[in-house]
């Protein structure tokens, strides 16, 4: 044992890296073997060996695997352990390197020493068995039993790189035979790294002696000297680090042993058995202390050597300091030059200071002059102050006088506001008496994604003023002013819009006819105002539902005095064709009786689903047809049994659109053309009504025919003008507002209520009976015409004009059994025509005309002579409908409804209306002018009716047959 310690200490003395560590390992190995024998070679022996090798760890003897893992996981302890066992073998990196790099270095060293290794994952989160086995193998390899030549050679190969040994060998081969020691080192398998320090110094002495003798040193010698010096320097530096570590180790061990001795001394008063055990435990510690003292003395000697090296380094630092002093002197000279420059700048500053002093004197003189001027101004201001006080007193007197006058003006202003409200009320009453079409303008808010766009709406007033701005023009042409009955801003709700229309809608129950229609470009919110985006949401419901809901509440509140019946029709005008939206299997427009709001919701849902809707660039849900919701109300007074009839037409017009912006093609282009055509026809009608032209072109479109009684009759009419505030739609907005301005100037006449008593109903029944008798006589006349052969020629021409099938709006009336036998309005209109034929025939007899001529005239009236007679008959029916408004506007409205939307079975309440129509139309004259003969006193027709129908007959003979009067087949809707 002592020989091994001496061997290890001798190797440390000659600075051998592997030898120096072997003595520590041998001593540690003996201690570890003793601890293994004491603890049965368990886990505690490994922990004790680690604490002894690296004292700063201070691991507890009973440390668990997790504590051991936490100590070894960063790899620093492993690398320090290997450096402690073999000093200088591991080069530690900086603190910035991760722990896995140190672990990889340790594992690479274990592979070079051919020792069992472990994986990085085992140390991080795996089983610690392989780690413990690897550490035990490392411990055994550096112990006394494992200290053999193979292990030593393996450690030496691991300590010195192969390229370095090869380089040194090559340098020694170039040395020649002059140095036997160098050649011997080269021929051996050991490098300079494995040579002892003493031999290296001897070799250096011999080289120096040889060089001093010959004074001729070759490159080989120089390289050898450099290699020797580098190895010596490296060993000395490593040894210094080892000395520091060992010194710390010895101090820690000494403190540890002292603490143990103190503990043992305090426990000496215990039992003898415990003292014996403690003595046994302290015995190896004492031996270790003796060994450490011996090692400490050796380390002190080595420390002196290191001290000499530090003195050499101090000399070098002193030389460097001298060089730095020279550099500092050079910098001092530069600073002196800068001081000279600073003095020159100081002189320059002095000259500038003198210049500023001169300026200061001039400024002082100027200030003194200004001070004198200010004193003069002060005296002047004092005089002005006295004048101002006098003027203030005068103003106070004037203000008190004007205040007294202003009180009277304020009192007059209050009365002026009352007068303005009264004038506004009277103006509305005058407008209602004149029958002007009311125009409400509603501005659609910006949609999502359009908030950043600039608006073309400049101002909206409370009294219906609207100012729009043209973004493309500047100056006085930028703004345009329009005035309407009401203007709703983008923030207005559906409830606010309906509250202004409620009084007009409620007048239906009093027997008035009301029409509300929405006009504007596509995507401006017409359908939103009339129907709403969702019927299920009460806040978003439009005028249609709110109007019907309000009517139901009124009918329920008045049910004790008046019994009401409400019927609903909903149609659309699609491509100049009328379609029923509430039923598809009925050829004509169907009337549906409703009794509650639930019925209305169901019907409106059906109508909205059946309505034609398409997507365009401007609007994803663009309405491609005009929607008409007609509400017919019939009320019977419980006491007087008088009948009230009113109708409400809620029209949602399709939006006008520019093909260039909407980018429609194909079927959508055709729809847009029909929509624009019908809206253009509506504009022509408005233009004619505004200028009070004698001829109004209602027949140019199905839309104008539907709105004929609302625009030209004595009904209450309201138009919603929907506009888009986007500046890109400025042209469409101005066009829409101009149209609305023309509409607001149309006078319809005072609206009248339709109310008939019991006597009127009896007279109408008598008239209907007389008409039935006339119809029978007309049939006998037709048989007589067939006998004379005229029927054949008339039928052939009729076949050319129009096939015998169901007619559409304004078409010629066929002589079908249903039309002939039914008591409706159309059959009675035909009987009126035959009655006029009889009157014409009787008048021709008084004039002495031929019988054949009368027959031909009757044939022309029936439509068997000329192709344009079909239109003439429709003109006669239109004249009957329009002229009836002279006596009662609601009668013509009901007649128009039945003419446009005939039903398979007319409701009973419509019979009385048709009888009243017949009574009003008794005086309608023939469509073709007769010969100038005195007329009998059988009937006295109205002058206005005769003149109007005769003028229509004259003009219709020159016009070609239009598509409006042609018959159409029942519509097959394709969705």
From Swiss-Prot:
GO terms of molecular function: ATP binding; microtubule binding; microtubule motor activity
Coiled-coil stretches noted in the UniProt entry, renumbered to this chain: 289-345, 757-788
Keywords of this entry: ATP-binding, Coiled coil, Microtubule, Motor protein, Nucleotide-binding
Domain Kinesin motor: 436-746
SMART domains for the chain: CH, KISc
Span list, region Disordered: 1-40, 801-852, 900-975
Listed Basic and acidic residues bias regions: 31-40
Tree of life domain: Eukaryota
Record PANTHER family: KINESIN-LIKE PROTEIN KIN-14K (PTHR47972:SF32), KINESIN-LIKE PROTEIN KLP-3 (PTHR47972)
Protein name listed in UniProt: Kinesin-like protein KIN-14K
Native source organism of the sequence: Arabidopsis thaliana (Mouse-ear cress)
Gene responsible for this protein: KIN14K
